[in-house]
């Protein structure tokens, strides 16, 4: 897989569930993923993607019961980096079509209580201008967890984007038009979790169990309209 064909789409890594972990990844170069954020409640509760100085994109199933700390610009979750910013959340806005049973429209916007200071360590990701296809290459997945242990540092992984047919066959009658799959069906590497926000997948990254991700390109209008009205 060529580097220049990899969509650097942060898959707002969801670590709400025990088995949502990186398999076969590596430690990201420090500060190489400036849009990655941590939803922090005394531990890395979930992940997200900074998409403007005031807004973070995450998964709807990551909505907490109260406001929490959004950590930006971090490489090590426990060690001060000198580049990190800690900002409280102000509002959580789930997509109105989110279905907790099917995980369709598993996407959410988080308004920050104050704007982030943008620099080379904290920088928004660019929303997609079109939907990715399997022939485009793969996706880049950063996360704060690994399958064999819980690392303190940000983990990275590059996995192929799978075709719709492959995705449907892996999860019969469970995939909607708002979902995409990424991973290796032969096992070995996966995020077990999103061109998109990490949504769901198998409990373990086993054979024929790719990760399922929310297709962010289907929600760009909703994202922009919500941000404009917020």
Question: In which residue ranges do the predicted regions lie?
Answer:
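Active-site substrate-binding loop(s) of clan PA
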Residues: 81, 93-99, 115-151
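Conserved hydrophobic/aromatic beta-strand scaffold that supports enzyme active sites
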Residues: 36, 55-57, 84, 107-109, ...
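Conserved H-D interstitial segment of serine endopeptidase catalytic domains
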Residues: 56-59, 63-100, 157-158, 164-166
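Extracellular/luminal ectodomains of metazoan preproproteins built from arrays
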Residues: 1-31, 116-120, 125, 132-140, ...
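Extracellular/periplasmic catalytic domains that process cell-envelope and extracellular macromolecules
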Residues: 28-32, 50, 64, 100-103, ...
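Protease-domain processing segments flanking chymotrypsin-fold serine proteases, especially trypsin-like
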Residues: 1-57, 68-74, 79-80
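Extracellular trypsin-like serine protease catalytic domains
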Residues: 18-22, 36-40, 138-230
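Alpha-helical recognition domains of nuclear gene-regulatory proteins
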Residues: 69, 73, 91, 115, ...
């Amino acid at each position: 897989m060529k580097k220049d064909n990899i969509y650097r789409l942060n898959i707002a890594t969801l670590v709400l569930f025990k088995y949502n972990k990186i398999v076969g990844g590596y430690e990201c170069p420090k500060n190489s993923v400036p849009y990655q954020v941590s939803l922090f409640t005394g531990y890395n509760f979930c992940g997200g993607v900074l998409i403007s100085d005031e807004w973070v994109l995450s998964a709807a199933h990551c909505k907490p019961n109260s406001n929490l700390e959004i950590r930006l610009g971090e490489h090590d979750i426990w060690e001060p980096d000198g580049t990190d910013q800690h900002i409280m959340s102000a509002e959580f806005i789930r997509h109105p079509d989110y279905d907790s049973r099917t995980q369709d429209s598993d996407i959410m916007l988080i308004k920050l209580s104050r704007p982030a200071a943008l620099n080379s360590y904290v920088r928004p990701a660019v929303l997609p201008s079109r939907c990715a296809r399997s022939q485009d290459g793969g996706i880049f997945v950063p996360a704060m967890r690994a399958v064999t242990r819980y690392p303190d540092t940000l983990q990275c992984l590059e996995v192929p984007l799978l075709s719709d047919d492959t995705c449907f066959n892996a999860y019969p009658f469970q995939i909607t038009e708002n979902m995409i799959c990424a991973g290796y069906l032969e096992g070995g590497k996966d995020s077990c979790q999103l061109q998109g926000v990490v949504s769901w997948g198998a409990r373990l990254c086993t054979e024929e169990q790719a990760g399922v991700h929310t297709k962010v390109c289907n929600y760009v209008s909703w994202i922009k309209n919500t941000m404009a009205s917020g």
